[in-house]
Amino acid sequence: MAATTTEKKQLRIATRNCGFIDPESIDDYIALRGYEGLAKVLTMTPAEVVDLVKRSGLRGRGGAGFPTGIKWGIALGNKADQKYMVCNADEGDPEFMDRAVLEGDPHSVVEAMAIGGYAIGATRGTVYIRAEYPLAIKRLKKAIDDAREYGLLGENIFGSGFDFDIELKYGAGAFVCGEETALIRSMEGKRGEPVTKPPFPAQSGYWEKPTIVNNVETFANIPAIIINGADWFSGIGTATSKGTKVFALAGKIQNVGLIEVPMGISLREVIFDIGGGCPDGKAFKAVQTGGPSGGALANKDLDVAIDYESLAACKSIMGSGGMVVMDEDDCMVSVAKFFLDFTMDETCGKCTPCRIGSKRLYEILDRITKGKGTRADLDRLKSLSEIIKDTALCGLGQTMPNPILSTMDTFANEYEAHVDDKKCPAHVCTALLTYTIDPAKCTGCGLCTRVCPVECISGTKKQPHTIDTTRCIKCGACYDKCKFDSIIKQ
């Protein structure tokens, strides 16, 4: 069967085995060259393994994009009686890239952690996973048990004298625990709060020992890189962003779900060729990349290459791979408020800019969406966002204002309409809506009068009705019920 356009645009490395093997069968994984990478690195020196990962150009897929090989090299160079390899499987935002890999190919992560352990001199690994992923936990536990039974974890792996084992620790899904120092504190039984760096975890992390924290997708790339070589991986992508990236397509788009594409592909190709564009003939308006802390990109950005530097230049981020598409019916002020509501709720509260600043930002946006905003509010919104971005302690706070700053930059006219005209161009903000009836279309059927909870619609049967706008609570029930499109929302 010929590949569809959607499939042709994709390249699966991190998700290469998902859907093709029984995730609970170690034999299925081994049949597709599983643990071959681990066997190969045990014939190399740790420095050679680190150098191979460096030359591949792999960057952390958890959001920051720090070169994985350099991070491993720092841990290798720090002498200690114990080192730790940690897998961050605690997806705190509403995306499921890590979950898909752990449920569909858990052995790729187990093997990669063992490879990483050998490379930095660690004998212990920990997967920090959110407790809300019961199937992923079940399959990961089985993968670890089976690997031990086959002699691929534990003592004297492949008769090489290398010892490495893995345990699980459970998180509660806090978004801030995606930050590596907060994650480590949580693993130690402390409150999940970030700490000032340096020292970096690769220097002093879990129990003050050198610790490498990589996310699931980063680890999933490692065995393929070891088997196929650094040149193979670095030949995919762009000059600064190598390999592929897994994205979760969501929102107003025909084809939702997970995709894996080469770095450097354009947003246009992802949204329209793979995603199929917006449904119901609606016009594309924006795409939020990078999850709740990302930025909104508009039509003018559709031909931007998806890599770390290009997205940053557009005031957005790669993040962990969220991609939410919005159409003509979405209000960008409400979108910014929606994402801020999430990050405000997820702040750990340790630093003042994030704890208090997020609340002040939300209050300003709330006033604007309720028709009470002023031009001074717009100035305050922008200046406070910039201050928080520069002064917050960790990445959560530093990227929190991204949705606000990007929408204010690209959709300034919408903010101005909310403030100056007290109108929501997308007809989303309830407080700024007005419902009226078009007498030319109204048949006087009475359906609207029966659903109005405050009885503010009046009229004679089979004659045009009217809405008392002074009593209307703008619930939209009449608009949804009318079969003749006679209710006007503006």
Curated annotation (Swiss-Prot):
Which reaction is catalysed here? Answer: H2 + NADP(+) = NADPH + H(+)
Q: How does activity depend on pH?
A: Optimum pH is 8.
The family database entries (InterPro entries) matched by this protein are listed as: 4Fe4S_Fe-S-bd, 4Fe4S_Fe_S_CS, NADH-UbQ_OxRdtase_51kDa_CS, Nuo51_FMN-bd, Nuo51_FMN-bd_sf, Nuop51_4Fe4S-bd, Nuop51_4Fe4S-bd_sf
Q: Spell out the protein name for this chain.
A: NADP-reducing hydrogenase subunit HndC
Q: How is its activity regulated?
A: Inhibited by oxygen.
Keywords from the named record: 4Fe-4S, Iron, Iron-sulfur, Metal-binding, NADP, Oxidoreductase, Repeat
Q: What is its EC number?
A: 1.12.1.3
Q: What happens when the gene is disrupted?
A: Disruption completely abolishes the NADP reductase activity.
Disulfide cysteine pairs (residue numbers): none
Q: Which domain of life does this protein belong to?
A: Bacteria
Job of this protein: Catalyzes the reduction of NADP in the presence of molecular H2 to yield NADPH.
Q: Where is the 4Fe-4S ferredoxin-type domain?
A: 433-462, 463-490
Q: Which Pfam families does the UniProt record give?
A: Complex1_51K, Fer4, NADH_4Fe-4S
The source organism is: Solidesulfovibrio fructosivorans (Desulfovibrio fructosivorans)
Listed under subunit, the entry gives: Heterotetramer composed of HndA, HndB, HndC and HndD subunits. HndC is probably the reducing subunit.
GO molecular function, one example? metal ion binding
What does the sequence similarity comment in the record state about its family?
A: Belongs to the complex I 51 kDa subunit family.
Q: Which PROSITE patterns match?
A: 4FE4S_FER_1, 4FE4S_FER_2, COMPLEX1_51K_2
